[in-house]
């Protein structure tokens, strides 16, 4: 399968081995793990950071084998899932950084004219293109999350309000 925004072929990556039981050295109980996940979530950690912390500091090799479900499913059951999915909010942050760069670092929240063709750094064609690619990825993800039902059907990405949406949902 090809890469999304280039003409390169993809390369196959490694997969974790198929494991159906926990190793004997893992002594974390399900209740202890649930409590730890909720405390890490209350500290404001994202799903990816929770997974890394559990792996590196608590020695949890496979969260799904202990809980019986994924981290997102566990947080959804506890009504603790953020309104905007993590991958979408990361892309929105990236688009905001690029747009702010193209606007010559104006203060936060003053993105007045969002048309890419009218940005002050008109010669920075590489970052303009990067912004276009990131925003197309955002639109693609929004379409997917609407189909799945993770985002409301009326939700839409607007660069003017992206900073407010990201900061209010953290």
Curated annotation (Swiss-Prot):
Q: Which GO terms describe its biological process?
A: translation
The cross-references to InterPro entries, in alphabetical order and at most eight, read:
Ribosomal_uS15, Ribosomal_uS15_arc_euk, Ribosomal_uS15_N, uS15_NS1_RNA-bd_sf
Q: Where is the composition biased (Basic residues)?
A: 1-10
- Any one GO molecular-function label of the UniProt entry: small ribosomal subunit rRNA binding
Q: Which GO terms describe its cellular component?
A: cytosolic small ribosomal subunit
Q: Does the keyword Ribosomal protein apply?
A: yes
Q: What SMART domains does the database record attribute to this sequence?
A: Ribosomal_S13_N, Ribosomal_S15
Alphabetical UniProt keywords: Ribonucleoprotein, Ribosomal protein
Q: Which intervals of the chain are annotated as region Disordered?
A: 1-20
Q: Would I find Ribosomal protein among this entry's keywords?
A: yes
Family, as annotated: Belongs to the universal ribosomal protein uS15 family.
What HAMAP family is this protein classified in? Ribosomal_uS15_A (MF_01343_A)
Q: How does it assemble?
A: Part of the 30S ribosomal subunit.
Q: What name does the UniProt record give this protein? A: Small ribosomal subunit protein uS15
The species this protein belongs to is: Methanothrix thermoacetophila (strain DSM 6194 / JCM 14653 / NBRC 101360 / PT)
Traced from the root, the source organism's taxonomic lineage reads: Archaea, Methanobacteriati, Methanobacteriota, Stenosarchaea group, Methanomicrobia
Q: Which gene is transcribed and translated to give this protein?
A: rps15
């Amino acid at each position: 399968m090809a890469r999304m925004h280039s003409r390169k072929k993809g390369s196959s990556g490694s997969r974790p081995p198929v494991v159906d039981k926990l190793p004997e050295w893992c002594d974390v109980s399900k209740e202890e793990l649930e409590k730890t996940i909720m405390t890490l979530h209350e500290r404001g950690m994202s799903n990816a950071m929770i997974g890394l912390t559990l792996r590196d500091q608590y020695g949890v090799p496979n969260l799904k084998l202990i809980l019986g479900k994924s981290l997102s499913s566990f947080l959804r059951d506890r009504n603790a899932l953020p309104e905007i999915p993590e991958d979408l909010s990361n892309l929105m942050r990236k688009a905001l950084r690029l747009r702010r760069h193209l606007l010559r670092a104006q203060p936060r929240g003053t993105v007045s004219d969002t048309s890419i063709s009218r940005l002050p750094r008109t010669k920075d064609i590489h970052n303009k293109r990067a912004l276009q690619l990131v925003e197309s990825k955002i639109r693609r993800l929004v379409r997917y999350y609407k189909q799945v039902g993770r985002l409301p059907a009326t939700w839409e990405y607007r660069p003017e309000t992206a900073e407010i949406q990201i900061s209010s949902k953290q």
